[in-house]
């Protein structure tokens, strides 16, 4: 039986041009092209950081895993929102005769909002899949962050005051209302690293970053809002974006530009440890994750039954929740429906699937 590992990531623009960024942004927005001013802002951000190394770094990570596991598994790589797209790579795997596939998403934490969006594409009549939900507790990954933060504390902070800010990509509040484990995993991840460092509870905190402006509330505090709200600041802030493993725009711009600039304004020294990227400790964590899961059950994936539809609204969106006073419908959805009209609101289908997942709404 031919087995494979499919390593997946979010993706990035295939070329740093206005239209290249527009294509990527349109994919993220479910095929709806954003307004030109939105594209221009994102394009300007990419120009500010000199492009994005994400695809290069990810391919190097894939090759390093292949060096370790390539004799046992075919190693494949796909993106969620840029080429090579997940469905195209699955077709290639089918052509290659793959029958079982371990899906290793290059995001250490599990969230309905993010990881289930990958699961949507895992459709094959030939291949059975095993999706690894999370792997943030791998000791070598914890050791990476601990070691790199400790270097900053020892070599750059010394005896001066500091605070470690663990930041993670924000998710919409409704994801948490229906049992999403993401926020608990982020807090647990931060605690594990802080314990290894011997930090006191007042020496670190959690914030959120990189939320999208899509008209719905996201979990708080946003990292920039947190900084502005503090009445007193330490001499050093150490920003640790633990929900990511590779350098990309949400680290290189959201942290290294926006957080850095605000620290300059506040008179505080900005620090960020290097990202795991291709470090051997990350590769150890990825390999150990595969080993810890490879004997679990593989199954045929039926995306419409396994996940909510993150990328496209149902054809019957307007019929899903007919009454805007349905008590199970979040307030912001009611407001969206009142403002835009039911036919133009894509969110209720997402909410419905999450309610089903949480057992609060019977499946059809």
Swiss-Prot record:
GO terms for molecular function: ferrochelatase activity; metal ion binding. Fe-coproporphyrin III binds at residues 29, 118. One of its GO terms (cellular component) is cytoplasm. The gene is cpfC. One of its GO terms (biological process) is heme biosynthetic process. Keywords: Cytoplasm, Heme biosynthesis, Iron, Lyase, Metal-binding, Porphyrin biosynthesis. SUPFAM superfamilies: Chelatase (SSF53800). This is Coproporphyrin III ferrochelatase.
